[in-house]
């Protein structure tokens, strides 16, 4: 095992700082447009460019060679941490937040598309801060690193390692031979979805600014809102159905969505994971509708269906918007909510969570084990889309699921040590690892009341969940650092 090429990592980080500084220019323009102080944004852009220049200088003598898996894992994790560390500056410089820990939490929650917030009220924030919160989620949706791989092919052979570290999971389709081509097309469809959603939201009761912010946070399944009451503040049936549709789309495999809009829709509709995810969402919606109807939550059947659908899709896609106070829906729905947080969208989507494909493999493997109890010599391979998964892939999925669940429960236990309640600890740990945003209980709307240890732990859980556990946990093992 060769030593880690830190010059390679420095060069990636340097390029990412320049990309992020360039992207923040749009927020600077928004500040000028709304006659807000440009100083926080100019200062932060300057820091991005200065740090980027230092890192590029450090990586200037990079020799062309193929990057290892370790370097890809370390680079991606470092990108998220560095951009969150610099990206938190506007919150402090504008006075929106005074605690560096709170500012870091808000930023990494944005970049990981979790959507948990330390703000108790957001409606008084400057327009530029709202746009930055939304923009962090939009960038984190498909992945800042994927964006860089798409536009900066100088990474050469290392591009695939960066891409793989950022987008771990079951992949069925390598529809283009070059990783940079894959990334470019993913970002093209991502941009198209964003612009379509902006127009559709603007047609409704939202003004243009709200439409832009919510389009950015919906298509990325992030969930930040410009309103304290989230989507309920708009009191619009049209808006709720439009957002529910696009949250569902955000939970689909983006590669298959690309095929669907380029003349091959059957690739999407025939995909086994897509069908499972759709049935899962519809089934949870039906059960929830029946439950809240029996509870007498809303006077009309349409109201019960709409609120059930919205909350199921927002949880099932890891978005985190809200039209209702789901804590009041009772423990039965809480269990449905936790299950939705566990599954959370398809592989290759912007959603967090275990992913529908892994959950489906678990079910199939469990079914095969039942059959083996009756017929011990029966050969029962696990199939996905008619293709047999190798034993090593199935074992990897099982290992991932065990680690995923263990991370949630260890995280919940540590949160309980910091004087958090049982329900709140379980829900917010699950929410952080699955990047779902708001939890159940005292942290349903904000984690402002959490202690410093809890907030720091949640930052770690959000990052581990966004990079699908193995990437971050692997870096913490002694074996990772051996030559």
What are these regions (language model features)?
Residues 1-483:
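Membrane-proximal intracellular helices of multi-pass ion channels
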């Amino acid at each position: 095992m060769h030593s880690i090429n830190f010059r390679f990592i420095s060069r990636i980080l340097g390029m990412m700082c320049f990309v992020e500084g360039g992207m923040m220019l749009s927020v600077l323009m928004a500040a000028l447009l709304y006659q807000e102080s440009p100083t926080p944004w100019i200062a932060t852009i300057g820091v991005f460019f200065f740090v980027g220049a230092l890192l590029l200088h450090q990586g200037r003598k990079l020799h062309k060679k193929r990057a290892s898996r370790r370097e890809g894992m370390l680079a991606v994790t470092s990108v998220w941490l560095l951009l969150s560390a610099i990206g938190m500056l506007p919150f402090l410089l504008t006075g929106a937040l005074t605690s560096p820990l709170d500012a870091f939490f808000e930023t990494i929650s944005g970049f990981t598309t979790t959507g948990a917030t330390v703000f108790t009220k957001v409606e008084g924030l400057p327009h530029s801060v709202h746009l930055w919160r939304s923009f962090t989620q939009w960038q984190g949706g498909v992945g800042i690193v994927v964006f860089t791989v798409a536009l900066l092919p100088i990474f050469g052979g290392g591009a695939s390692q960066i891409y793989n570290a950022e987008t771990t999971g079951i992949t069925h389709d390598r529809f283009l031979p070059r990783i940079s081509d894959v990334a470019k097309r993913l970002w093209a469809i991502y941009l198209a979805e964003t612009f379509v959603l902006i127009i559709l939201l603007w047609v409704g009761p939202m003004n243009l600014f709200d439409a832009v912010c919510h389009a950015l946070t919906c298509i990325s399944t992030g969930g930040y809102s410009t309103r304290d009451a989230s989507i309920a503040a708009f009191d619009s049936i049209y808006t709720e159905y439009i957002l529910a549709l696009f949250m569902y789309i955000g939970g689909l495999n983006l590669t298959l969505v690309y095929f669907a809009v380029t003349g091959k829709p059957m690739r999407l509709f025939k995909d086994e994971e897509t069908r499972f995810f759709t049935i899962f969402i519809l089934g949870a919606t039906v059960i929830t509708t029946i439950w809240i109807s029996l509870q007498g939550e809303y006077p009309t059947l349409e109201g019960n269906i709409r609120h059930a659908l919205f909350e199921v899709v927002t949880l099932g896609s890891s978005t985190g918007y809200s039209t209702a106070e789901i804590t009041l829906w009772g423990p039965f729905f809480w269990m449905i909510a936790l299950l939705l947080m566990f599954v959370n969208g398809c592989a290759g989507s912007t959603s967090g969570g275990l992913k529908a494909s892994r959950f489906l493999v678990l079910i199939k493997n469990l079914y095969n084990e039942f059959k083996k109890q009756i017929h011990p010599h029966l050969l029962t391979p696990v199939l996905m889309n008619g293709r047999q998964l190798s034993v090593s892939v199935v074992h990897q999925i099982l290992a991932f699921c065990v680690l995923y669940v263990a991370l949630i429960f260890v995280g919940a236990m540590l949160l309980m040590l910091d004087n958090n309640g049982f329900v709140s600890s379980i829900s917010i740990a699950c929410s952080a690892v699955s990047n779902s945003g708001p939890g159940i209980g005292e942290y349903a709307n904000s984690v402002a009341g959490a202690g410093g240890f809890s907030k720091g732990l949640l930052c770690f859980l959000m990052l581990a969940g966004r990079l699908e556990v193995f990437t971050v946990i692997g870096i913490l093992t002694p074996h990772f650092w051996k030559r």
